[in-house]
Amino acid sequence: MDIKRTILWVIFSMSLVLLYDNWQRANGHASMFFPSATQQQAASAPAASAAQGDVPKANATAGAAAPAAPGGAPQAAAQPTGEKIIVTTDEVRAEIDTAGGILSRLELLNEHEKDGKPVVLFERDTTRTYMARSGLIGGDLPNHTTVFTATPGPRTLDGADKLEVTLTADKNGVKFVKTYVFHKGSYVVDARFAVTNDGTAPVSPTLYMELARDGSKVEQSQFYSTFTGPAIYTDADKYHKITFDDIAKGKASTPAATTSGWVAMVQHYFASAWIPQAGKEHSFYVQQIDPNLYRVGIQQPLGQIAPGATVTTDARLFAGPQEERMLEKITPGLELVKDYGWLTILAKPLFWLLEKLHGFLNNWGWSIIALTVLIKLVFFPLSAASYKSMGKMKDLQPRMTSIRERHKGDPQKMNAEMMALYKTEKVNPLGGCLPIVIQIPVFIALYWVLLSSVEMRGAPWLGWIHDLSVPDPFYILPIVMAVSMFVQTRLNPTPPDPVQAKVMMIMPLVFSFMFFFFPAGLVLYWVVNNILSIAQQWQINRMLGKGKTAAVAKS
């Protein structure tokens, strides 16, 4: 039996490793065993190019990714140069490059890095590329390689509720006007596009709006991963993540043309999205532009424009933090960029409850503690049933050991006698595991709530914990967690299998090492959960002890 248990433990451990590796790859991270295409490109390619001569081709068929080769207009010998317009609101500081009318830099003024500087979402330099672009396809028309002229006007809100930046370009008889409207207290920029045919023949342009980004991860951790890459949403196909690796391998696909949905670039805590005008038919595309540069976009045909006529259309550009309630109000499905994985059905109500607790306590750290306590109380009956079953199994250990010794040469007879013993004593050998298994998805869902919630960024708890989204600077919480895990292990019945016993002794050390690098909010959750489990186990053992004493007294 011992060798069988050892084999089962090996299989179980390997399954966990493979599941973890699959989770890593699902989030666009590298496999632990095989280098991905994006890994190999990142190793061999220079920094992501910020070249602008990569105008997309019109989509030939809906539902297919754009070809990997750059298409469209011929590339100029030198990159165009334009004016950098700096727009400042109460939420963002944006840089608009008139060379292409591109949003080439965006700082989130109320979200800060560890050094206190604003988070930079859009950026274009020699080391990083992430920008929002738009233009026209259909002949040599104004696009994101064309130099625009900016209309003079205010560049800061200065008490106003909104400000507009208007850019104009004329090319081959077509005038293209982009107007960006920035609003007070908002991460949404309204985009108005007007196309005028100043020529003598009809034109049929297609408007494109895209997000271009290098394939580098914002964060790197060996112990937890979050998705970085494009995403597409439609009413029919719902939320669809696309990994950079799939784009590089030509495996990416996009939904069919529709009148709903949006495209986004997603990373930990933040996202950007182009949201086209509702009711206008459009198609989607994803593409690898350079070895480490990718894009996701929308193409919207504007129909035939007669000479002298003008066609207008609107869109919205979101760029900001993944605040769930804010995203829900912008457009259907946008809150899904906050990725809870396959446990969304559990994670969303848990976050709702966490928000409610924060409304009372006004501190995310205490809210995490309160939520963990509530969950423990809800599951207390299941835990009591589990410990009761394990207690019965412990009482049967001497008789089970005797059966194993008597029939160690006859596994079939040994198993039959074991089952007879379970039936006689009314014990379910899985009774101690099933209640715990039921609880596991809830605790995993809470783990992902805490990992993905931007509200934890910069949120203090008490004393030395000034930011629940970064590791404990003094490693106090991981050490407390190690001690609590060790105590919890000692309180549990010693497994009869020596291999299991060794694993149970080593686990506190392994987990403690991992949690040294985890965000403090996650470690706080595990510490509180462990301490409550110890208290719960003591109380249940006390209750079971009283029950045994009463039973002995009656007999």
UniProtKB/Swiss-Prot annotation:
Any one GO biological process? protein transport
The record's annotation in InterPro entries points to: Membr_insert_YidC, Membr_insert_YidC_N, YidC/ALB3/OXA1/COX18, YidC/Oxa/ALB_C, YidC_ALB_C, YidC_periplasmic_sf
The ranges of region (Disordered) come to 61-81
Report the subcellular localization: Cell inner membrane
Q: Which GO terms describe its molecular function?
A: membrane insertase activity
Keywords tagged on the record: Cell inner membrane, Cell membrane, Chaperone, Membrane, Protein transport, Transmembrane, Transmembrane helix, Transport
Return the Gene3D superfamilies for the record: 2.70.98.90
Name the major location: membrane
User: GO cellular-component terms in the record?
Assistant: plasma membrane
Entry's transmembrane regions: 7-24, 341-361, 364-384, 430-450, 468-488, 503-523
The annotated topology with respect to the bilayer is: Multi-pass membrane protein
Q: What function is annotated for this protein?
A: Required for the insertion and/or proper folding and/or complex formation of integral membrane proteins into the membrane. Involved in integration of membrane proteins that insert both dependently and independently of the Sec translocase complex, as well as at least some lipoproteins. Aids folding of multispanning membrane proteins.
This protein's assembly is summarised as:
Interacts with the Sec translocase complex via SecD. Specifically interacts with transmembrane segments of nascent integral membrane proteins during membrane integration.
Q: Please state which protein family the record places this protein in.
A: Belongs to the OXA1/ALB3/YidC family. Type 1 subfamily.
Q: What is this protein called?
A: Membrane protein insertase YidC
